[in-house]
């Protein structure tokens, strides 16, 4: 019997959308966006994070000033309870997706051998 991988992928998408992890993430995201101050703070954090990632991917050096600014931004958002909770929920969702990716990649790892060693 042939497996339609797209159907399986869409089933997985629906399962993720229905999960407690995603529901919590979405609720926290909505709460942060409903608070104008928190929304601006979170958007600023994301902008700083994105700029640093882009520089890193382009092979550009990140200055000490940028590191200091990023640290200040992280410290600020971590003090905001809802943003901090949102970041924790994002991390949990990222871990879940990482675990799913490991499961999906398992046949290739078994075929070619583990990249890790």
UniProtKB/Swiss-Prot annotation:
Residue stretches spanning the membrane: none
Signal sequence, renumbered to the chain: none
Recorded coiled-coil stretches: none
InterPro entries: Com_YlbF, YheA/YmcA-like_dom_sf
HAMAP family xref list: UPF0342
Family, as annotated: Belongs to the UPF0342 family.
Protein name listed in UniProt: UPF0342 protein YheA
Lineage: Bacteria, Bacillati, Bacillota, Bacilli, Bacillales
């Amino acid at each position: 019997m042939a497996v339609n991988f797209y159907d399986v992928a869409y089933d997985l998408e629906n399962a993720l959308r229905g999960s407690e992890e995603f529901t919590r993430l979405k609720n926290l995201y909505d709460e942060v966006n409903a608070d104008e101050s928190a929304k601006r703070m979170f958007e600023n954090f994301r902008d700083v994070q994105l700029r640093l990632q882009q520089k890193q991917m382009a092979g550009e050096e990140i200055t000490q000033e940028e590191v200091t600014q990023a640290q200040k931004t992280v410290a600020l958002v971590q003090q905001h309870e809802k943003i901090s909770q949102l970041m924790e929920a994002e991390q949990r969702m990222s871990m879940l997706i990482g675990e799913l990716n490991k499961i999906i990649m398992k046949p290739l790892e078994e075929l070619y051998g583990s990249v890790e060693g």
